[in-house]
A protein has these predicted regions:
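Catalytic beta-strand/loop cores that center a nucleophilic Ser/Cys/Thr
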Residues: 13-139
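Short secondary-structure subsegments characteristic of cysteine-rich extracellular domains
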Residues: 160-177
């Protein structure tokens, strides 16, 4: 669990998951690794209908976002990251969309299990099997967008980039460039 650094003196650095080292990824990106499955993908459903975030979904008329793709057949799959305010997701971080409809082979990662029946956050197991798409701005004006899924990029080129995942990402990047 600890590794001795090379050089003068005895300096030990703890290795392993950021979460166990006191710096969970939720603090940096808004989301952290929560579940994993076979190389299959699912879709996102919009969760945030606040008018302040309509710009993210401009040009998207479908309810399901990313129910297609070259990586597992969907934008949300393989590894799923979710927001967790208890682990450091910033309070101003908004969950824009969450995935659902994952195959039964998806399981929580070990650090989410308290026992074989309960989870660390105390939430029902199925509710943690999701990818969250999040957005927030930090105190220095930086903007953060996280997809919460490793297969998101595989949905971008679907239909020659003429799809709701590409539209959504274009909306985000246009906002970032202003």
């Amino acid at each position: 669990d600890s590794v001795k650094s090379r050089g003068l003196g005895d300096v030990y650095k703890r290795q392993g998951l950021w979460r166990r080292n006191g710096i969970p990824p939720q603090k940096l990106t808004g989301v952290g690794f929560s579940a994993q499955g076979q190389f299959t993908g699912s879709y996102y459903l919009r969760k945030n209908y606040d008018k302040d975030f309509d710009w993210v979904f401009r040009g998207i008329n479908e309810n399901k976002i990313g129910n297609f793709g070259f990586s597992g057949g969907g934008a949300a799959g393989f590894e799923l990251d979710r927001a967790d305010y208890k682990l450091g997701t910033p309070e101003n971080c908004k969950i824009l969309a969450s995935s659902e409809g994952h195959d039964n082979d998806y399981v929580l990662v070990p650090e989410e299990h308290l026992t074989h029946l309960t989870t660390v956050p105390g939430d029902p197991l199925k509710s943690l099997l999701r990818a969250d798409m999040v957005y927030f701005e930090n105190s220095n004006g930086g903007k953060v967008f996280s997809t919460g899924s490793i297969t998101f990029c595989g949905s971008l080129p679907h239909n020659n980039f003429n799809n709701n995942v590409s539209t959504l990402l274009s909306n985000i990047l246009n906002k970032f460039s202003k």
